[in-house]
């Protein structure tokens, strides 16, 4: 097991209905984000000194498998959020390999990550919730502190 198979997780929020995808979902909130959005909803995922715990995909599965009945009965599953979950593509790929295949995997992402992550996730994510922020590059940069060229490129890729 490599360090890439460990991921910093800020929170796990269970029994979410109609918020993060179909059916009952569990939101897994990853720590860290490349953006610094002016009105960030989850600053605890990137602020210095924020709490998180390192988990392996196996540990995450053990933590959420108690909700299997809900996922199976409602067509739900796991939603990866953050922070920026697409940065944890290797972790998510391993989780998909070991989790029940009936579980849906969703992601809430800014897409402002290297395309290799999107490529790795493209075959395993069932539903993408993409927070584009703004398509105007100047407004995007003012709002997030970053350029949106990677977002546009990843949208075209998907």
Regions found by a protein language model. Give the residues of each.
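N-terminal [4Fe-4S]-dependent radical SAM core
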Residues: 1-54, 66-72
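A short linear-motif detector with a strong N-terminal bias
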Residues: 4-9, 57-59, 106-109
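Flexible, glycine- and charge-enriched loops at secondary-structure boundaries
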Residues: 50-57, 144-148
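Conserved AdoMet/S-adenosylmethionine-binding subsite of the radical SAM
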Residues: 61, 65-69, 74-77, 81-158
């Amino acid at each position: 097991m490599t360090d890439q198979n460990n991921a910093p997780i800020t929170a796990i929020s269970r029994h979410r209905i109609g918020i993060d995808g179909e059916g009952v979902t569990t939101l897994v909130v990853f720590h860290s984000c490349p953006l610094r959005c002016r009105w960030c909803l989850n600053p605890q995922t990137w602020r210095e000194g924020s709490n998180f715990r390192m988990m392996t995909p196996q540990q995450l599965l053990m933590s959420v498998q108690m909700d299997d009945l809900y996922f199976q009965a409602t067509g739900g599953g796991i939603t990866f959020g953050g922070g920026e979950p697409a940065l944890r593509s290797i972790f998510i790929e391993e989780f998909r390999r070991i989790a029940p295949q009936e579980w849906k995997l969703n992601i809430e992402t800014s897409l402002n990550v290297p395309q290799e992550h999107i490529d790795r996730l493209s075959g395993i994510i069932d539903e993408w919730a993409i927070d584009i922020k703004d398509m105007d590059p100047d407004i995007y940069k003012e709002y997030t502190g970053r350029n949106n060229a990677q977002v546009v490129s990843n949208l075209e890729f998907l």
